[in-house]
Amino acid sequence: MTVRNLEYLFRPASVAMVAEPDEPSRYAEVVLSNLAAGGFSGPVMSVSARKRPLIHVGHDVRLGEFEVAPDLAIIAASLDLVPSIIAQLGARGTRAVIVGPWMWHRMSASAIDKARKAIREAAKPNLVRVLGPGSGGLVVPAIGLNASATPVPITPGKIALVAQSTALTAAILDRANSKGIGFSTVLHLGSDLDVDLADVLDWLAADPDTHSILVQFDEVSAGRKFMSAARAAARNKPVITIQPGPVSGRHEGSGPFSTADVYDAALRRAGWVSINTLGDLFEAIEAMARIRPLRGERLTILANGHGLGRIAGDTLLRSGGELGSL
């Protein structure tokens, strides 16, 4: 589906929280607190439950309390309730939802699969875009949108961070905060039932607030779609990824992206830069935060040796560049 209706996810004019009175409600309370702290200027719609404004839903879900349809809804509810919530939101005009964490241990594998299919069917009639289930949320600091449970303040910047690992996302945000590095977008994918990495890359490639993209992922579900988006993103701005390695369950020959070598070759061909360690990752983040767009077509090379300068100049010319002079 690519970027259709993603403007309601990344640039919503209004937000709503939908939660049930259970463990996920704590997540909902933190997200609402972050929305308030981030300074989101649009309405955050809700009704009263507990001590914080939450939509209090049970198995008989009714969302008629909304005065207007929210562009974006954040859902913190059991997976079996999510299809009904999405159907009602979609009928009212909502076009994007974030489905947050839920209690995996309470559902069998078959029940989870059934719920995922039901979510797809509920979203389809009104073209509702679904981030998740299991997404840690989305942050767009420039518009004050912090629809996540992250405890770390995130300032505006020019780097987009897209990740599948919540732990690594937290580590990156903590390090960036200590260095005064900001982000244009921070997004945790969760399980890519609808909005996947390729969709997000297509959006970020055209986003004027994003100058570089940092990606962490374990696997992709649609290889051809992903590679098309990966190439398009790298044509527009630098893309860096922390190299995924072989993990349990991903064996040689199990698919087009079954080993670290295949990942690396595919990403290098797309124009991405792969790094292998957390140390390199943090150095890359600092470099990305400080790079500036090049102006003009020429490049002047300064070297402390004739041989090194000549190698650099030859590489530049072979790549279609033009040498400048002082």
Give the role of each language-model region:
Residues 1-326:
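Catalytic-core regions of core metabolic enzymes
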